[in-house]
């Protein structure tokens, strides 16, 4: 079946559809603007023109840096990453002759998916009913909504209910990606090792190149190939923490997408929308500044926190982990080829405070990394379902470790 640039194979049995799709021979027109070489992606981001920017600034950074006893600078890189849910997107759609449509989907926002499906089908949204069913997970904006739109278009063409189940390589290849980005930190220290100014900038592809709501047909794969235009909003994020520096500038900049048209390299929200990227970089930088100041990483963070809940979370995780005060970089111990260290990170998101201490072992001979213990302080206010929260925390730890070590695409 073919509608505009959307091609699909429908068969009574899944394996028959797979075999038939593998035998298709399709001639595509080559686009004029190819992908950036992934080996050059960070240089591309550094040099690309800025499409949009925003900042949060207070104090006089220029004066503070001019009188600094020491200046610390660092840069961090974050690659494109797939949402990589436990299973790729799947949906079932039943489009009747009069346009009445039912879609069964595991997307995070079925109400918005119904709007996107209606746009792809050219029917009023009142005719579309989206029923949420348990899926493999939805982490920001994965491929679940795309599967719903694909199934609906195929059902409309076939005149029968259609189930779309992406192959694993399709899910990894075509789902919206976490945007690649670079993050630069610059801090001014006085003679006592205190931060008197901090400048932190993130630059990368937009977190809303593909809108996370799926409400517009152009923000779904099917809609893109049917010729619909997406919203293509330019946006990134600022670090989400409560550090109080007298002089501070937090800023972000976005660059244009690598392709202007339908593309398998679409960028969108990753988890909270960009918490992993920004927290990784901003907290790594706080550690580097603590090291330059000769300070303990826990004590150094507490210097700049004033909110009771933030302070309590950092203190609680340090106590539970058995944190022993000492200069940053001095916790390394050795047992044969195994070097052990520990670190702390803290962040907040929508009034939830999280602090974490992680013990890490590295085999210097083989390069193998092992994390024997993770301690988490998680203050989200009133807890309604302790078991669900426990799973959220454990899932965050597992996914964070996996993304840190394995999931560049």
State where each predicted segment sits:
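Structural alpha/beta core scaffold segments of enzyme domains
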Residues: 1-382, 406-409
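Conserved phosphate-binding loops in nucleotide/dinucleotide-binding enzymes
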Residues: 383-398
